[in-house]
Curated annotation (Swiss-Prot):
Subunit structure: The RNAP catalytic core consists of 2 alpha, 1 beta, 1 beta' and 1 omega subunit. When a sigma factor is associated with the core the holoenzyme is formed, which can initiate transcription.
Protein name, entry field: DNA-directed RNA polymerase subunit omega
GO terms for biological process, alphabetical: DNA-templated transcription
Highest taxon of the lineage: Bacteria
Family label: Belongs to the RNA polymerase subunit omega family.
Native source organism of the sequence: Aromatoleum aromaticum (strain DSM 19018 / LMG 30748 / EbN1) (Azoarcus sp. (strain EbN1))
Gene3D superfamilies: 3.90.940.10
């Protein structure tokens, strides 16, 4: 399992407040059933928030998630 740091995510979304909102919205989408956009191993038992941060750090999700609204 790769470690995700806030610094990795801040490279994609420089504003901490927007990063928090984007991660929260995306985590809610994943919780409701949206498919994660990053590769997950079967042994990974990451929470939706960690998956959302992985997606942001990988550049798969950005501020556009805020424009889509909640799921």
């Amino acid at each position: 399992m790769a470690r995700i740091t806030i610094e990795d995510c801040l490279k994609r979304i420089p504003n901490r407040f927007q990063l928090t909102l984007a991660a929260t919205y995306r985590a809610r989408q994943i919780t409701i059933g949206s498919t994660p956009q990053v590769e997950l191993e079967k042994s990974d038992k990451d929470k939706p928030t960690v998956i959302a941060l992985r997606e942001i750090a990988a550049g798969k999700v950005g501020l556009e998630v805020l424009n889509r609204g909640q799921a």
